[in-house]
Regions:
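Glycine- (often His-adjacent) and acidic-residue-rich active-site loop
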Residues: 42-46, 53, 61-95, 108, ...
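Hydrophobic alpha-helical segments typical of transmembrane helices
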Residues: 85-89, 144-148, 157, 209, ...
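Terminal peptide-recognition signature
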Residues: 22, 26, 41, 59, ...
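Conserved CoA-thioester-binding segment of acyl-CoA-metabolizing enzymes
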Residues: 1-62, 91
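C-terminal alpha-helix plus adjacent terminal tail
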Residues: 1-17, 165-171, 186, 190, ...
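Hydrophobic alpha-helical membrane-association signature
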Residues: 37-40, 85, 115, 188, ...
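Crotonase-fold acyl-CoA enzyme core
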Residues: 94-204, 239-240, 244
Length: 255
């Protein structure tokens, strides 16, 4: 697999056992995201999507916070066309077909929170705060958060986040299903990496197809979802991947 040429060392990548680990590496600025960083992230996602060797992507942030969101100075100084780099990244992560895990600690501000809505499993440290201060910045919620948050956590909780700008703490985020697991800070990376490694060992086509069904079902009527998942279930069972897994299980049961 040929890795893309990156514009800076503010985004690091490490591939281990079918997992691409992407690290936001700007701890002195709380991993605030610049246009160049967004471009690097889009390139890495494209590489991961095209590679048969990568089954899962893991996002993490170096230092005490996952991400402070957009670098406002960079955003204000962006050249024509660069202001859309964040949107390109959100579109890329939304469309990404493989499973994405996130390890989140400290503050996740703005897009640092809304990007998580397009990832599949979020592991948070106990000190995590999900902060969406869009109105306070004279803006509006982005990355589909105005649709996804009310649908997932209820309008009133979403209004606390998006209108009042109240931080969502890790414990409540776990309780209402915004994150999959909350762990101690010193256990965060190991927990997220173990989760990613576990996912990467699963049959890749089945994993991707299951993610697609879950994501697409959000906007489809139940009867259509049932029809499509039953058809895909039958198709997958006839595939080489499922046959190999089932044959191995039968062989093991026979001793």
């Amino acid at each position: 697999m040929t890795m893309p040429t990156q514009e800076s060392d503010l985004v690091l990548v490490n591939n281990t056992e079918s997992v691409m680990e992407i690290t936001l590496n700007r701890p002195d600025k709380l991993n605030a995201l610049t246009s160049a960083m967004y471009r690097d992230l889009v390139k890495l996602l494209a590489t991961a999507e095209q590679s048969d060797d990568i089954h899962v992507v893991l996002f993490r942030g170096e230092g005490k916070s996952f991400s402070a969101g957009n670098d406002l100075v960079d955003f204000l100084n962006a050249k024509p066309g660069e202001a859309g780099e964040a949107a390109h990244f959100i579109q890329a992560i939304h469309d990404f077909p493989k499973v994405v895990v996130a390890a989140v600690q400290g503050n996740a501000v703005g897009v640092g929170t809304t990007m998580l809505l397009h990832m599949d499993l979020v592991v948070a440290s106990e000190d995590t705060k999900l902060i969406t201060p869009f109105v306070d910045l004279g803006a509006v919620p982005e990355a589909g958060s105005a649709k996804l948050l009310p649908a997932w956590i209820g309008y009133q909780r979403a209004a606390r986040m998006l209108l009042l700008g109240e931080p969502m703490l890790a414990a409540e985020a776990l309780e209402i299903g915004l994150v999959a697991k909350v762990v101690k800070g010193d256990e965060l990376d190991a927990t997220a990496r173990n989760m990613a490694a576990t996912l990467a060992k699963k049959p890749p086509r089945a994993l991707q197809a299951s993610k697609r069904l879950m994501r697409e079902s959000i906007n489809k009527p139940l009867h259509q979802v049932v029809k499509e998942d039953l058809a895909l279930f039958g198709e997958m069972l006839q595939g080489d991947e499922a046959k190999a897994v089932i044959a191995a299980m039968v062989s093991k049961s026979k001793g």
